[in-house]
Amino acid sequence: MEAERRHRALYKGTTPPWKETYRKRCVERLKRNRSKLLDKFRQVGERIHGGVGGSFLVQEVMEEEWKAMQSENGSFPSMWKKEAFSQALNIMRDPDELATLEEIKQELLLEEKAMIEEFENILQFEEQCLDSVVELSTGDQIVCPVCNRNYLTVTSCFIVCQCGVYINTQSQGMSIEKLHSLLESSLTSHGYHCTKLPVFSVATELGGAASLFMSCQECDAMVVIL
């Protein structure tokens, strides 16, 4: 107890020396857990605000970084070296230290909120992409992604459209289902890193064979579909 009182007296009214290091490391850990946050976001779907305090990872990030810094000699004052983050909070009575942790928590919540808003845009774009594929596909027919007017004739050997598209697919064993899957996966994959809808075109390669390309002027992406 005496050590705790000396510690509080030493830093009373000043910024705790661990604050900036802990804050930076928490922010970095949250950003590194971006894919984990996206997975959690996908799992809850419409229950976006169902997490504790409206957060998905902030508490977990703060606890993990706390434990990581505990393992580094001298990183935290000895009074904090408890078995769990919650236990340490229970003994903290210094208003400056509590305010510091709350400040860090609020910053992390804002960072997480910004990431979630980005994820919402990504998921919205994915839905638009899927809608685009649905619009291209009617029953057992697919609208040509190049002209967006005529239905494609799809066989195991070729794909052809009245607009002039002709692609030899003999070596690929093409079908309506396979083409639909290729278009859907390509649009979804593009949507992970760009929010603009790409366009489709046909180009002849060096060997003389025609291929279907998907390209985007926004992100300069170009993908061979088939």
Swiss-Prot record:
Domain of life: Eukaryota
Compartments, record wording: Nucleus
Protein's recorded name: RPA-interacting protein A
Stretches annotated zinc finger (RIP-type): 144-219
GN (gene name): rpain-a
Taxonomic lineage from the root: Eukaryota, Metazoa, Chordata, Craniata, Vertebrata
Keyword Repeat among UniProt keywords: no
Swiss-Prot/TrEMBL GO biological process terms: protein import into nucleus
Organism: Xenopus laevis
Cystine crosslinks: none
